[in-house]
Regions:
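N-terminal type II signal-anchor transmembrane helix
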Residues: 1-51, 115-116, 122, 224, ...
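Short extracytoplasmic
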Residues: 48-73
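Membrane-embedded beta-strands that build the outer-membrane beta-barrel scaffold
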Residues: 212, 225-227
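Secondary-structure transition motifs
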Residues: 2-6, 52, 72-185, 218, ...
């Protein structure tokens, strides 16, 4: 009897020892090997497939809580110029991924992402190669009409982002910066007809604002929501046009808010409604003139009831209201009005 009891105790000790050993091995694999494997494979993929460089700071994974953390990542050109970076990425996965046969993430949080978006003189974009592999996979999936993989994300948040944009196709490079950028996505699912709620907000260095929120479905692909652009400066528009117009947009702001409804299946349908488009304190000068005095000042323009339907290729505007407009004109030696030069320049352009 004693020998049997001792044998049972020995087996228990052996089982506990094996279990403890497996836990230690599991912990070592999760804490040490997986972060190393992720770092090596990520850098190899970026180097060999994308022809870029990837630097990663601290990479850690907790195999007991399924929490992945990556800090101080930087994607760069071969020349060393930065394409994108972020301060911190945290992904909290769930064990439910196993029995739900889906990628289930409780939370994804990206802090301080920084993207340098450059349009080269030939029209190419510096991030084109980043989506090359994904495009091949997407094309193959489209040919076979394979369903999307099941993905569920409880919350995805992007905090304090920044995008620096440079367009080198212009006569002089046009630059603009959006910061800070915030984005939130809640209860995301790729399930059929599931509505995913999102909210996006950004501000330019000039104080111009963009807010975009609504819902979208992954299957079929579609979206509806509302958007708002506030205090878009006339100077920003003029800086981008760079002399394509005979007039210069010297002052003023443009603001509007609207709603949209987009469907991509079975055909593209897009309806946009703009209840009011507001132009405030617009001032226009002649670009070629030696003085900088405005040739036209319009304190207030309101365009109301604008409806755009892509499906029927129709645009409707209910009302255009102009208040307090002042135009400065003089008669030239040939008897024509000075403002007629603007229409002549436009025709030549």
């Amino acid at each position: 009897m004693l020998r049997a009891l001792l044998a049972i105790l020995a087996l228990h000790r052996l089982a506990l020892g094996i279990a403890a050993g497996l836990i230690v091995v599991y912990a070592l694999v999760g804490f040490l090997w997986l972060p190393h494997l992720l770092r090596v494979n990520a850098q190899k993929y970026v180097s060999e497939e994308l022809g870029r460089g990837l630097a990663l700071g601290d990479v850690s994974f907790n195999p007991f809580t399924f929490r992945l953390s990556i800090r101080d990542a930087k994607l760069s050109e071969k020349s060393g110029d930065a394409i994108a970076s972020f301060q911190s990425l945290v992904v909290n996965a769930e064990l439910a991924s196993i029995w739900q046969r889906a990628v289930v993430l409780k939370e994804v949080q990206l802090d301080a992402p920084d993207v340098n978006l450059v349009v080269e003189r030939d029209g190419s974009v510096n991030v084109t190669n980043l989506v090359r592999a994904g495009s091949k996979v997407a094309s193959a999936a489209a040919k076979t009409e394979a369903p999307l993989p099941r993905v569920r994300i409880g919350r995805l948040a992007v905090n304090s982002g920044r995008v620096a944009f440079e367009d080198r196709t212009r006569p002089e490079p046009f630059t603009a910066t959006l910061a800070p950028i915030h984005f939130a996505l809640t209860d995301f699912r790729t399930d059929l007809n599931h509505e995913n709620a999102y909210d996006f907000a950004a501000q330019s260095s000039a104080g111009e604002t963009l807010h975009w929120s609504g819902r979208f479905t992954a299957q079929p692909l579609g979206s509806d929501g509302q958007f708002k652009i506030g205090q878009l400066r006339a100077q920003t528009i003029d800086d981008y046009l760079q002399g394509q117009l005979p007039i210069r947009l010297a002052d003023g702001t443009l603001s509007f808010a609207g709603t949209y409804n987009l469907s991509l299946h079975p055909t593209l349908l897009l309806d946009v409604g703009l209840p009011e488009i507001a132009f405030d304190n617009f001032a226009v000068t002649e670009r070629a003139a030696s003085d900088s005095q405005p040739i036209a000042v319009v304190p207030k323009i309101r365009v109301t009831g604008t409806q755009f339907a892509f499906g029927t290729r129709s645009i409707r505007v209910d009302k255009v209201q102009v208040e307090g407009a002042r135009v400065r004109a003089s008669r030239e030696a040939d008897g024509s009005l000075s403002v007629s030069r603007l229409t002549q320049s436009t025709a030549q352009a």
